[in-house]
A protein has these predicted regions:
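Extracytoplasmic cell-surface/polysaccharide-interacting catalytic and binding patches
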Residues: 26-119, 134, 138-171
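Bacterial Sec-dependent N-terminal signal peptides
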Residues: 1-30
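Short active-site loop/helix that positions an aromatic residue
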Residues: 131
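Segments that shape or occlude catalytic/ligand-binding pockets
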Residues: 124
Length: 171
């Protein structure tokens, strides 16, 4: 149990570090949305930012981490909103540094005969707004005026599972 707690703490620290690195300002005049949150609204601008900083690249977790188990709750009605928020999807995404860190944690967990099941990773900003409309409590949903690690591709909702049985660990 100590090793599991250690791995989860390590994952949290790594993801928080990457989240901070991802959110550094590149000297570009930012745009704000209706909440005053700085956003990139033009895909061409985003592509330019990725060329300047590959850490902003979003990567497909199924390709980045072979064997990763996904149970994307917001593509089903099995979530706190009790409705499908995403179309049926078969993968999800994270920024490259977060995905690299997650891959390292999965490799360490394999030594303990465990792996990770992902419930959610990258989340479109529009979904954050829908969640906030239903639950205006930042203990349970991200305040759209701040955005979230999910919106930035730097957060995952997950649990640990046995890789053979796919049974979730009690946590």
């Amino acid at each position: 149990m100590f090793k599991i707690k250690y791995c989860l703490r390590l994952l949290t620290i790594i993801l928080l570090f990457n989240f901070a690195a991802i959110n550094q300002v590149n000297g570009q005049a930012p745009l704000t949305n209706k909440y005053g949150l700085f956003v990139v609204k033009d895909s061409k601008v985003l592509q330019q930012e990725i060329k300047l900083d590959s850490n902003k690249q979003m990567v497909d977790l199924k390709r980045q981490i072979p064997g990763l188990v996904l149970d994307l709750k917001y593509a089903t009605e099995d979530n706190f909103m009790h409705q499908k928020l995403y179309p049926p999807v078969h993968t999800t995404f994270l920024r490259k540094p977060a995905a690299d860190s997650l891959r390292k944690v999965v490799e360490e967990l394999k030594k303990q005969h465990l792996t990770i099941k992902i419930f959610d990773a990258y989340r479109p900003y529009s979904i954050t707004e829908k969640m906030w409309e239903k639950v205006k409590d930042d203990r349970y949903a991200a305040d759209p005026s701040k955005g979230s690690g999910h919106n930035r591709g730097a957060a995952v909702d997950l649990t640990l599972i046995d890789p053979d049985t796919k049974k979730e660990m009690h946590m």
